[in-house]
A protein has these predicted regions:
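Phosphate/ribose-recognition catalytic cores of enzymes acting on nucleotide-derived substrates
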Residues: 188-302
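N-terminal catalytic cores of NTP/NDP-binding nucleotidyl/phosphoryl-transfer enzymes
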Residues: 2-63
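A structural preference for short, hydrophobic beta-strand core positions in alpha/beta folds
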Residues: 42, 82, 143-144
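A short acidic, often aromatic-flanked loop/helix-cap motif at beta-alpha or helix-coil junctions
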Residues: 1, 87-90, 147-152
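N-terminal Rossmann-like or analogous alpha/beta NTP/dinucleotide-binding catalytic cores
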Residues: 49-137
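Glycine-rich, Lys/Arg-enriched anion-binding loops that position phosphate/diphosphate groups
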Residues: 134-236
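Residue-level signal for inorganic ion chemistry
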Residues: 19, 71, 111, 171, ...
Length: 302
């Protein structure tokens, strides 16, 4: 257990997808924790604030079930603190958020936020106000400037736009890693194995996830500490199924075995073609063969 009496260097943000900007915040938290002899932490919320404030679901880059693990893995912080964002939190004065919550409840000895971070009721808290209040409290504060790629500010909103366009290469540049879908392998209808002779594993896409366009992608699948390239379909399989919830179905190349019940991570590297309804099973098989060839060629270049 982490000693709660130690001061924390706390990075603030929602940390959806853990992009390059998030990493800069967490790197500074790790650095400051060592400086103050404390622990590094992320403070985030259990739900996206806009889902409460605006009353609409925000498509996420990381499913809620896996956010803690991804933040710790990619950020290197000691702990992740999830605050419950409800109407009480929404109406909390920004000074109370700093003094009563971050300092009083979570023993912040240093706070790190981004230049555009807004917090407290109506988003009235900002970097300038944070600096003043931290100085009053006798704790440290760092404001991390925007991270830009090709002159464009790195943000979860912009990354969602790239994913919606199927630009996996662009999304990876802003994330600092491939866009990844994580889940537990389920039993499917076995169409890939029995009809197409191309066995696949089946994941149900979490409803809160940002969806890329339906189609076939060149992917890499990570499972049990090993990596396999795969041609992966995302969508509703219109050739065989009339409607239904979207699924993600990787066909792992050069792999044989049963992954049912295992957690896998599917990295989406490149959009190959849109999902479509084929006139025959043979036409679909030919398209899959071409997608497998494209996938092998892509990863052979690495």
């Amino acid at each position: 257990m982490i000693e709660v009496t130690k001061p924390r260097a706390i990075a603030l943000g929602y940390f959806d997808g853990v992009h390059l900007g998030h990493r800069a915040l967490m790197q500074k938290a790790v650095e400051r924790a060592k400086q103050i002899g404390g622990t590094s932490a992320v403070f985030t919320f259990d739900v996206h604030p806009d889902s409460v404030v605006m009353g609409r679901q925000v498509p996420l880059l990381t499913a809620n079930a896996y956010r803690r693990d991804e933040i710790k893995l990619l950020g290197g912080v000691d702990e992740v603190i999830f605050g419950h964002f409800d109407e009480r939190m929404q109406h909390m004065d920004w000074r109370d958020f700093i003094h009563k919550m971050l300092i009083g409840q979570f023993h912040a000895g240093w706070i790190i936020s981004g230049r555009n971070n807004r917090f407290g009721y109506k988003g009235l808290g900002n970097a300038e106000g944070m600096a003043v209040e931290c100085e009053k409290a006798g704790i440290g504060y760092d404001c991390i400037e925007d991270i830009k790629v090709y002159g464009i500010e790195v943000s979860s909103t912009y990354i969602r736009q790239l994913i919606a366009q199927g630009d996996m290469e662009g999304a990876a540049k802003f994330l600092g890693h491939p866009y990844t879908v994580t889940g537990i392998v389920e039993h499917g209808r076995r169409v890939g194995t029995s009809v197409l002779k191309v066995p696949t594993v089946n994941l149900r896409l979490p409803s809160e996830m940002a969806l890329p366009p339906y189609g076939v992608y060149a992917t890499r699948v990570l499972v049990d500490g090993k990596s396999y390239i795969a041609a992966t379909n995302i969508g509703v399989k219109p050739t065989f199924v009339d409607g239904g919830a979207p699924t993600i179905e990787p066909h792992l190349l050069d792999f044989s075995g049963d992954l049912y019940g295992k957690m896998i991570h599917v990295e989406l590297h490149k959009f190959l073609r849109p999902e479509m309804q084929f006139e025959s099973v043979e036409a679909l098989k030919n398209a899959i063969d071409e997608n497998i060839r494209q996938t092998r060629d892509l990863f052979a270049e690495e």
